[in-house]
Structures are given as structure tokens and as C-alpha cells.
Amino acid sequence: MRIVVIGAGGIGGWLGARLAASGQQVGFLVHDRTLAALRSSGLTLCDCSRGEPGFVTARIEMPLASEDPQALTETLEGQPDLVLVTTKVDALAPLAPALRVLTGPGTGVVSTQNGISAPGLLADAVGREHVLPGVARVYSAVASPGEVRTIGGAGSLALGEWDGAATARSRAAVQALEAAGIRAWIPGSIWAELWRKVSFVVVQGALGAAANAPIGVLRSDLRDAFTRAVSEVVAVAAALGHDLATDAAPDPVAEALRMADAQPAGATTSMQRDIAVGLPSELDAQLGALCRAGDEVGVPTPVLDLAHSVLAPREAVARAGA
């Protein structure tokens, strides 16, 4: 399978290293320091579940990497079967020209970003018929350009067609991911799966950033606010036609609380960490989009709105100084 991974950070490095190590034809669309690192030192994926430095789970000595999408397609001898888009949401609109170069008639373009915004932005670039909304779950981070560390196992990626159809390309993508040691599946509704993640990760990031607190504080001192915020997300999703209940977890709010209770007490989200150090974050793409969705369907989201009101001025300052 010909695969292009856009980005080689925590998500892109994890996916790309595993897929390349399993024998897939993988190219990375990257820039600047990451491009230089991949070309000079390769790509290393380490499992640090038992502490650093961890052990190497995938090592790609000479990965195919370029900042030119046309060069990647030529080296791969054709447009990719699959494009895994792993950059932050802010990068998606500027990526549109590159995505159009990479996307052939049968190419699937997979989103991996947190929040509800990414699939629509990708559809604006290449059309809904190419977009496979994805839900990535892994604890990963960049130790340095070209070196990615994971904690807690190989991770997972759910994906599906925009319209829910069962297709050969989505099944082929799942097979390639499974062969690379990544748990992958096509859920009954990829949109419900996306909203399930939003109900936990975006709430954790929003309340955690507003309170400057890790999950250990949110699930104890701020448990009531956390519960109400999750309930708001579940209600918005339901108004949009997405039932977040499953056979294994019939109460999605209780399931989010169970997940919160299972996290390491010091856990934070990437959006939360960006806000904490004054960097531009995905606040609008994650929390802002969620609040707007509530407004559009007439579902009140007072806890989420309050968190957004607290954080929006900080985000404006961060972007003004960027």
C-alpha cells in the first residue's frame, strides 16, 4: 500500500514508523527541522511505558521524506492509496494545495485530529468522497525531531467513510494498520466514535486549561463541573443524531468518568499544555467548534461556554505574539 503521512510528530511519527516497519510504502510530507532530522538520523519510535529511555519498537533508517508532495508521488510511483493527516487543525487549510496533489481518484484521506473540525476542513480541500474521518488513541510525544515516544501500548485508530458505507479502501486501511501492530477498526458510526472522544478529550483539555489543573483535580475537586460538561457534549451529539451509548457503555457520561478515573493523576492534553505555556492552541477548533455546534442545534452548553470565555483572551494574546 502506498501511504503518505503528513507530519511526523506524536501521531504521524507513531503511525508512519509502525507502517513503514511493517513493509508498507510510506512517505512523509514534512518541513524544516523534522525534514532535516528524518533525512540525517531517520525515525525512531520508542515505548517508554516502563520509563525512559524505553525500548525501540520501530526504527526507520532512511525514511522517504520531502516537503514537496509531487516528489513524494513520483518516488512512490503514483498517488498514495492512503493519506494520514496528523498535523494540528490550523495547518489543514494551508495544506489544501498539497492534499490536492496527493489525492488520486481512489485515495482515502484520514483525519486524526482532536475535535469535530478536521473532517470538514479536509472535505473542503479534496471533497467528502475522499475523507475518512479518523479517531486516534495513543499516548505519544516528540522527544526530539525524528524521535517519538509512546506510553501504554501500540495505540489504536478507528476510521470510516463519511457516509458510513463499507468500502474496500477502508478495509484495506484497517488491514494495513493491524499488520503494523496498531489496533484498527471500522465502527458502526465513525461520527459517534469521534464524538465519544470529544466528550472526554476536549472536556479534559478545556476544563483543565481553564483551571490550570490535571485530570486528577478534574475528577475529584471539579468532578461536578466535569460531569456537566461531558453531559453537554453528549446532548449536542444527540441533537446532531449521534448516539454515544454502546452495548459495553450504555451511559456515555459514566463512561467518560470511568476513563477520567483510570488516567494517571497528572495527565493533561496537548491543547491544555499549549495554553499553559502561552502557545497558540486548538482552542477554537476544539472547544469553540463545540460551543458553536451547541448554538446551532439549540442545546445549552453553559460549562463549556464559561471555559471558552475564560480561555479565549489568553488564546488571543498567544496568537498576537506568535
Named regions from a protein language model:
Residues 3, 25-27, 109, 131, ...:
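Hydrophobic anchor at the start of a short beta-strand
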Residues 43-65, 201:
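N-terminal glycine-rich dinucleotide-binding loop that anchors FAD/FMN and/or NAD(P) in oxidoreductases
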Residues 1-53:
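NAD(P)+-binding Rossmann beta1-loop-alpha1 motif at the extreme N-terminus of oxidoreductases
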Residues 55-147:
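Rossmann-like NAD(P)(H) cofactor-binding subdomain of soluble oxidoreductases
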Residues 227-322:
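NAD(P)-dependent Rossmann-like dehydrogenase/reductase catalytic/cofactor-binding core
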